[in-house]
Amino acid sequence: MDDRAELDTTGIVDRAVSAGSHTILAPPHGRGRPSLRNRVALALLTLVNWIVPKKRDKFVLHGIPLCEDGILAVADELFVRGLSSIVLVADHQDATRASAMFCSPAVFVGKRSIAALWHYLTARYIVVSHGLFGDPRPPPWQCVVNLWHGEPTAKTIGRYIGRSRINVTTAPVLSHVGQAYRCTEFGLHPKQVPILGAPRNDRMLTADHAEVRKALLGADADVPTLLWLPTYRSVVNGTATWIDAAVRFPGVPYDLADLRRIDDWLYSNSARIVVKRHPLEADTVNYQFRAIAFLEHTDLERVNETTYTSLAAFDGLITDASSVWTDYLLLDKPIIFAFPDIDDYRASRGLNVEPYEHLVPGPFVKSADEFIQSLDRFLRNRDEFAEARQLARRRFHRFCDAGSTARLLDEILPGRTRFPERTRP
């Protein structure tokens, strides 16, 4: 990271303040407008939501994927404060899976049921990682918290890609940089975007990383291993297809020939890479490697772990436009940015922080040769970006502790004390 490449967010903040809750930046491209039927349904839901009385201290949670780390952290903190939660899930099968992952007591309700809608309408507090029921505008007496699932330091979202304003009460972020972008992405006033940290990071910082490493790597637990978390390029949802880059890759942004070269080098140098594809990624790698393994969400669930409890179990991170690298700064471990299609991605999807190549706190590589060279430096313990990571951590994090969830609930539940005898499960 170049010290001279400072982020100037003043203009963004000024526009956010002056526009109030109607912040607008011209998006580079649009994603389409909801149908008339959906708009009418949303208007009716909004009206009913303003009429139905809310139950004090009633929390409804919803995360994607099923056991999203931020939602799990909130459920645990609610338990510490003597509160329970209702968790919306897809179906009975998901309810069974979730019951094994949620350490704190919760009631699981199918999201498509009348009961789920009634819980939503009667809840004083709604906490989500994405949208829910079309994001109707909540009344002042209902608090809707959108944790989101990453800091806006990489790919564009929300209004930048033509989406409408996100109707929430609170959307916590990590820093002033995140606050500036979140205001414009979601169309929120800065007062709605408090700098509190991210609940998902509490789970990353408090997990038993040695035990998680043993559970995930087994006999290879003593072998140098990096975790590769690429963002998605293609999403297929029913009949809809969303493409963020012109070239389709097999789950990671390199073709099979390059992956085989990287795999051969890793095997020859007694190192490993574990790839966890993005949950939305439609493409997969159909090849058996010797030193590259693939980790699915179900593999984590099998050992009762999640993405964030597993992060520190690895020796370093490989990523591209995934905002996970911002969270990973709290661990102060090496990060490799493998982004061969950045020009294509920049033109198609767009990046928030530019020039991205010069601002990221780690080696930025495109070709397989550059990738292998960065792996070689990693194995030789040539950490040339330690100072850059420290600078990035100061820039992108106000808090570096595991107290983000507590700060969030202090914000929305003023005066609600914690019970000393109740520790997090």
Indicate where each model-derived feature is located.
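N-terminal pre-catalytic "stem/leader" segment of glycosyltransferase-like enzymes
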Residues: 2-119, 415-425
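C-terminal amphipathic helix plus adjacent low-complexity
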Residues: 2-29, 363-425
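A nucleotide-sugar donor-handling region in carbohydrate enzymes
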Residues: 26-46, 154-157, 166-251, 279, ...
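Active-site and donor-binding regions of nucleotide-sugar-utilizing enzymes
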Residues: 57-205
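Conserved catalytic-core segment of nucleotide-activated headgroup transferases in glycan assembly
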Residues: 69-83, 200-289, 365, 406, ...
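Donor nucleotide-activated moiety binding/catalytic core segment of transferases
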Residues: 109-123, 279-326
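A donor-sugar binding/catalytic signature common to diverse glycosyltransferases
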Residues: 125-148, 152, 302-349
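Catalytic binding pocket for nucleotide-activated donors in carbohydrate/polymer assembly enzymes
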Residues: 290-299, 323-397
